[in-house]
Amino acid sequence: MSVKGVEMPEMTWDLDVGNKWRRRKVLSRIHRFWECRLRVWWLSDAGVRETDPPRPRRRPTWMTAVFHVICAVLLTLMIMAIGALIAYLRYYHQDSWRDMLHDLFCGCHYPEKCRRHHERQRSRRRAMDVPDPELGDPARRPLNGAMYYGSGCRFDTVEMVDETRPAPPALSSPETGDDSNDDAVAGGGAGGVTSSATRTTSSNALLPEWMDAVHVAVQAAVQATVQVSGPRENAVSPAT
């Protein structure tokens, strides 16, 4: 077959009937997308057999059994640990999570005393606008931030005492005749170190015994250093 002298191939029936390739339905993009999703999600049985033929099922080996046992044991231990932690917190720290954190990280051996201490702190924070003789002048309260926002741990700082100055007079009440500070005045340096260490550590009722001993030793060493390095009254000046 030739058209105007140009040889044309013999047209088949499919191409001859209205050019079938021009009459195919052109789907929109969203239509093609959803058609693809439906074909993936809801394949017919024939489609499943064609795309994914049945494979022989793998038999579980002893490694698989060991892995399953280990996973089951770990899961059981984790659940038991969480249950034990919840039971511990509910039994010992049912009132306050803050007290629980304080007891865990500050070494508190008397939770009731600590709880009352925190309750007093909270009540003082609520009543910051009310004058309190224990807190001092309300206008100067922001300067006492450690009293309100401290951690509550009873670790007192080391008290620096200048042994070169004369000791304050003893505070003795005429009714009881309590002259507990007279030995510190008459004893001089060593007596002052012992009495001040005892006085400081007596307020540390929440610390264990070994911490009290460490505290006393540190205070004695610091005060001995201050006493040695401080100016002496009878020392001769090198200028003279």
UniProtKB/Swiss-Prot annotation:
Record keyword Transmembrane present: yes
Gene Ontology annotations for the cellular component aspect, listed alphabetically: host cell membrane; membrane
Stretches the record annotates as Disordered: 119-143, 164-200
Topology within the bilayer: Single-pass membrane protein
Locations listed in the record: Host membrane
Keywords, comma-separated and alphabetical: Host membrane, Host-virus interaction, Membrane, Transmembrane, Transmembrane helix
Transmembrane segments: 69-89
Subunit structure: Interacts with host ATP1B1.
Family: Belongs to the HHV-5 UL136 protein family.
Descriptive protein name: Protein UL136
Native source species: Human cytomegalovirus (strain Merlin) (HHV-5)
